[in-house]
């Protein structure tokens, strides 16, 4: 059984998306038990439309829903202990849930998660990891927005956590890890990135295979399983990729409807275009993972539909089933244990 708490009021559409999304996820994973946090007046009628979900859930009424435009500090002051977002996160502390999923305000969700769950021992700052479609399948990119201007040690931590996530998600023994840089040569890039590369290489971490520096086009190629960067460049890369996917989809749609011949050609090529659309569907890779906390937090896109939210639940389910938290803790313990041993004076 996997216990998943949901911030039912989070996102642009709240329970109108979260509840049917949870119902879809339950169809795929019948061993889920949901703990729902929301405003009863908005949720009761929607839940009644999904009797299987209702039977597999417990519902907690909450006074407050965090707004999508609220500042993190305001959301903390107003919603601590009372909002659906806070209570969904706190369900992990109360041992009622193994993972929390929310489509709410990213800044507020991160602030509440850090305040409520705290960071793991040895982790200075958390990271947001995104699952990224590539020519070879999927890769993980982190950080995509949590820590702007991460230093070398924080990038080292991200490499450890990203490697653990890749082992949990892709089931590879030693995932390849690359540092995003402006070139692959050792002399290029900011000092923090070059120092992080040295730290990762010298640490010789058991759970990852350090590839070296990678460039922006390596992300989509799937050159490595994990791409490590700081939050500013990672977020720009993510938004640029999402925008490019929409742009290509619009180009194809316009091209296929321009002339009668193009429309006829589309009929014959429809299956190929359907496969392309499936590959580029952002709903299939919805669900950013907050790494470095004493609990698993999944962030869905705020504008996700029911299928997109269900995909975010799928990510949380997989992370619990494959022991993400334990893998990160074990890797951190090995790394920091080795560092402590090296620091001891020689007899």
Curated annotation (Swiss-Prot):
Catalytic activity, as annotated: a fatty acyl-[ACP] + phosphate = an acyl phosphate + holo-[ACP]
MF terms (GO), sorted A to Z: phosphate:acyl-[acyl carrier protein] acyltransferase activity
GO cellular component: cytoplasm
Annotated InterPro entries: FA_synthesis, Phospholipid_synth_PlsX-like
Signal sequence, renumbered to the chain: none
Documented EC number(s): 2.3.1.274
Protein name per its UniProtKB record: Phosphate acyltransferase
The species this protein was found in: Sinorhizobium medicae (strain WSM419)
Encoding gene, per UniProt annotation: plsX
């Amino acid at each position: 059984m996997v216990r998943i708490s949901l911030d039912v009021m989070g996102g642009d559409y709240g329970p109108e998306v979260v509840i049917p999304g949870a119902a879809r996820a339950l169809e795929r994973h019948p061993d889920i038990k949901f703990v729902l946090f929301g405003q009863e007046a908005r949720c009761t009628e929607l839940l009644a439309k999904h009797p299987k979900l209702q039977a597999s859930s417990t519902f907690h009424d909450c006074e407050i829903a965090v707004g999508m435009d609220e500042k993190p500090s305001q959301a903390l002051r107003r919603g601590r202990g009372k909002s659906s977002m806070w209570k969904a996160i706190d369900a992990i502390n109360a041992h009622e849930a193994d993972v929390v999923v929310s489509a709410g305000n990213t800044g507020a969700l991160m602030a509440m998660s850090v305040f409520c769950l705290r960071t793991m021992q040895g982790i200075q700052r958390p990271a947001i990891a995104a699952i990224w479609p590539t020519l070879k399948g999927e890769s993980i990119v982190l950080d995509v927005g949590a820590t702007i201007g991460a230093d070398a040690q924080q990038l080292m931590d991200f490499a450890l956590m990203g490697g653990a996530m890749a082992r949990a998600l892709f089931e590879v023994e030693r995932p390849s890890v690359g540092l995003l840089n402006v070139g692959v040569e050792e002399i290029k890039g900011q000092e923090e990135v070059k120092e992080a590369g040295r730290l990762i290489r010298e640490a010789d971490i058991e759970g990852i295979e350090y590839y070296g520096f990678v460039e922006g086009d390596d992300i989509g190629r799937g050159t490595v399983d994990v791409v490590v960067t700081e939050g500013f460049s990672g977020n720009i890369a993510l938004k640029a990729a999402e925008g490019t996917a929409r742009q290509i989809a619009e180009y194809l749609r316009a091209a296929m409807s321009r002339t009668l011949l193009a429309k006829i050609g589309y009929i014959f090529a429809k299956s190929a275009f359907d496969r392309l659309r499936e590959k580029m569907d952002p709903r299939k890779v919805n669900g950013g993972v907050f790494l470095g906390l004493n609990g698993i937090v999944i962030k869905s896109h705020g504008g996700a539909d029911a299928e997109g939210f269900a995909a975010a639940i799928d990510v949380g389910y997989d992370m619990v089933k494959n022991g993400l938290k334990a893998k990160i803790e074990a890797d951190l313990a090995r790394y920091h244990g080795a560092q402590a041993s090296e620091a001891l004076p020689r007899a």
